[in-house]
């Protein structure tokens, strides 16, 4: 079975079995809603068990979650550093022009048919995602995911076409 990362448990929260999660999903409300089923993977990326979300709330930059049947700190403390993943068949369909992070990370970025680099990470600083592009012999390039910059995403061809606006590339 194929799984995709949706968050990392970074700490416990209080004594009632809540955990702080750093999400790596655009769909946190859906992923962490009550009744959602996720898989726990340890720090060596080995499957541990499937869990069901009992509760979810936001606190600062964290998603605070609780697993069904685990209502005390002693039951969940061992999960610090573990990853939460969703099974591929539970991901759901996206609208046209929407993508999962795992589909974007690793794509090659081109400007006017010149290879710029490869997308290595996606940041969520505010209104728009920012794609971090690893380049040869240059610093990483930060590209906002907006229509005037990202012109075309072709998952099949493993390619993204962009127009790097003036001011985005401080090495030119």
Swiss-Prot record:
One of its GO terms (cellular component) is ribosome. Keywords: Chaperone, Cytoplasm, Ribosome biogenesis, rRNA processing. Transmembrane segments: none annotated. One of its GO terms (biological process) is rRNA processing. Residues 95-168 form the PRC barrel domain. The keyword Transferase does not apply. One of its GO terms (molecular function) is ribosome binding. Its main location: cytoplasm. Signal peptide: none annotated. InterPro entries: PRC-brl_dom (IPR027275), PRC_barrel-like_sf (IPR011033), RimM (IPR011961), RimM_N (IPR002676), RimM_N_sf (IPR036976), Transl_B-barrel_sf (IPR009000). It is found in: Cytoplasm. An accessory protein needed during the final step in the assembly of 30S ribosomal subunit, possibly for assembly of the head region. Essential for efficient processing of 16S rRNA. May be needed both before and after RbfA during the maturation of 16S rRNA. It has affinity for free ribosomal 30S subunits but not for 70S ribosomes. Belongs to the RimM family. The PRC barrel domain binds ribosomal protein uS19. Binds ribosomal protein uS19. PANTHER family: RIBOSOME MATURATION FACTOR RIMM. This is Ribosome maturation factor RimM. It comes from Streptococcus equi subsp. zooepidemicus (strain MGCS10565). The lineage of its organism: Bacteria, Bacillati, Bacillota, Bacilli, Lactobacillales.
């Amino acid at each position: 079975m194929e799984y995709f990362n949706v968050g990392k448990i970074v700490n416990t929260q209080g004594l009632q079995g809540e955990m702080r999660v750093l999400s790596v999903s655009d769909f946190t409300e859906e992923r962490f809603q009550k009744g959602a089923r996720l898989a726990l993977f340890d720090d060596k990326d080995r499957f541990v068990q499937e869990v069901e979300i009992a509760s979810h709330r936001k606190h600062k930059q964290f998603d605070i979650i609780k697993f069904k049947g685990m209502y005390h700190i002693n039951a969940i403390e061992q999960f610090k550093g573990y990853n939460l993943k969703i099974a591929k068949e539970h991901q759901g369909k996206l609208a046209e022009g929407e993508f999962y992070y795992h589909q974007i990370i690793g794509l090659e970025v081109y400007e006017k048919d010149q290879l710029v680099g490869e997308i290595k990470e996606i940041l969520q600083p505010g209104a728009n995602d920012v794609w971090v592009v690893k380049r040869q012999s240059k610093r990483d390039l930060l590209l906002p995911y907006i229509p005037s910059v990202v012109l075309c995403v072709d998952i099949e061809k493993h390619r993204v076409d962009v127009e790097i606006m003036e001011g985005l590339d401080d090495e030119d």
